[in-house]
Amino acid sequence: MRNKLSFDLQLSARKAAIAERIAAHKIARSKVSVFLMAMSAGVFMAIGFTFYLSVIADAPSSQALTHLVGGLCFTLGFILLAVCGTSLFTSSVMTVMAKSRGVIGWRTWLINALLVACGNLAGIACFSLLIWFSGLVMSENAMWGVAFLHCAEGKMHHTFTESVSLGIMCNLMVCLALWMSYCGRSLCDKIVAMILPITLFVASGFEHCIANLFVIPFAIAIRHFAPTSFWQLAHSSADNFPALTVSHFITANLLPVMLGNIIGGAVLVSICYRAIYLRQEP
């Protein structure tokens, strides 16, 4: 009887062809379908970050093991993305392969990317409301909410260059994880291939614009709308988190990180690998 367990992997050129076909297929979907799938992706990312934060909320931030375990927990969000076939902005930038092939123009690519980003934001907003009304912010004597605040505050003090660089490295890992998942022939293969790259980016503190769309606006909401009882339990005050404002988030984090994510995914993975494996020889 043939053993079904196998380490048989797709060849690199085969992976590139698969990635190109997936990119073209994503672009060809209806706008409603793209938006709904992007909403699901936003929810999954928020779920992954909620798992991550629930694990590290009461742990010392200096412990390497805490970062490792937190990173492993965060991979849940990406596993859900891979299994359910949704559209995340940072991985959808790989659809630039379809542009390189000449299937679409830049306008179509840009509209698709913006639609996915808006869908991700809508999904995150829906899940954030559930988290807010669930009372989790007050759990563990408000430690859960305080962890959100400290995590978000720490993301707001990078320089522009640092934020872009962290964004590049983050989406390099995310898109390589996705690329590696194309190697696998089974669900287990795909999941295992994704775990370490995602864990690395989380444990190393790289910046992901869609994850930040969940954690930082939610932390801003806590800072402005949390009841007095929250601050009493936390033995803190809103004044201890001055960087958590909408304008500062957009200029100091969201825009530079998004730029870095686009460079990391579209240029360093999609365009480079297409040039290596699918470029037509003269």
Which residue ranges define each predicted feature?
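Alpha-helical transmembrane segments and their helix-helix packing motifs
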Residues: 1-282
